Structures are given as C-alpha cells and as structure tokens.
C-alpha cells in the first residue's frame, strides 16, 4: 500500500500464517475485536469503500444489496436487555465485595475477642500462681510461729484469731486491687496496642510488596528492546496496525505471531501509549 511520505520505505512484509491479534487503542474501530487481519474489515463492514459484498456495486443506490454479512449495529433491540444484565451483574459484584469486606471485619473482631479471652485466662492463671505462692509463704510463717511457740521463745508476737482474720482480709483486698489494676492496664494495652501492631504489620507487608513490584517492573523495563522508525508508515487498519513517523521510538512487546512463531510484523508501544503491529523492516534496533 502506498503511503504519503517524502521517503518511500521498503516493501511491506507478508502477514504470518498464524495471523496477528487486534490491539485495542482509543481511536480504534468498535469492531476491531472481530478482526485479526486488515482485510477482515472489508468482510465485517460492508460499507468499506462503499463496495462491500454487493453484487450491484455501491455506486447504484436504487438497486438493493444482497449482502449476507449484516453490519454490527449498536442500537439493535436485543442490546437493551444485555446492557441491563451487565448493570445488574456489576451491582451484584459490588454487593459481593461489600460482603467480603464485612466478613473480613467480623473475622478480625472475632480474633480480637479470642485474644482478649486468652489474655484474661492467662491473668487468672497468674493470679492463681501468685495466690499459691502467698499461701505457701503464709503456711511457712505459721509453722515458724508454731515452732517458736513450742519452744517458748521470748520474742514471740502472738496474734489472736480475730487479728489474724483482719490482717488476712486487708491483705486479700490489697491483692484484689492490684489484680484489677493489672487487668485494666492489660485490656487498655490490648485495645490500643493490638490495632497499632496489626496496622504496622500490614504496612510493612505493603511496603515489601511494593518494593517487589517495583523491582519486577524495573526488571521488565530493562529486558525490553527499543527500535527507531527509519521510514513513515500509515496503518491500513487502526485496530491492528500502528502508524509510524520517522524518528519514533517504539518499545518492542512481541516479535511472534499468535501461534508463537517469529514473524516480520512486531507488536510495539509508542511513548504516547498507542500500541499495535508495525513492519520490522521499517525500523532499526537501538543498541544499549
């Protein structure tokens, strides 16, 4: 195909047997997903050059056409229910995502509750252990008093049962107040410290994942090949081919066709974000 350019480029290479896939650009045709070859546009669109598969040609508008290929219209009556179903599907997906978020929140609350329960159980065990230790100390003091009383030691400070009960009650109240203070502090620390620890943990995980993704992107960019357009090339189908201007820098995305075989048509991406297929003999590889 001849192009409007000052310097005529080499002859275009032939398309591979496996074909090439259409690329979705912003200025591509709406039916480009159907075409995998530039000539397919003449099949899908019967008004291509106003000469589709019309046996009476497109120059005579008084003779009806017998084109078996019906053009793709977007305003057909059947597209209304399809769009409604798509809207319903998107709503159902949004509700499902909200349900997943609520479920994860409930699981986090349940885990926090289990953590508080385990902390309270450990505090009760600690209380029992401390009580046992104080009981042993009290028993030893009683044995000491009995031994001293048995040997009639002069420095015995005898205590009647009433005074001992009052002392034991005061000591028990003091222990209970200490236990209540410790329990309150543990609950406050759990309510404040546990969410902070979880947030810090997730933040560290997010930072590590971000660094890994950046390293992968950097590695992928380093492995890309770049080429420079030596000739101008006008695309024959915006849905498949990509236009080139002399001096354009293109990142090579693929050098194979749809079947994985090497071909002379390469898939690339320009700095503007446009992607498509272009002839390899119109460009030269940039050496690093």
From Swiss-Prot:
Interacts (via SH3 domain) with PEX14 (via SH3-binding motif); forming the PEX13-PEX14 docking complex. Belongs to the peroxin-13 family. SMART domains: SH3. This is Peroxisomal membrane protein pex13. GO terms for biological process: protein import into peroxisome matrix, docking; protein targeting to peroxisome. Keywords: Membrane, Peroxisome, Protein transport, SH3 domain, Translocation, Transmembrane, Transmembrane helix, Transport. Residues 1-32 are annotated as: Disordered.
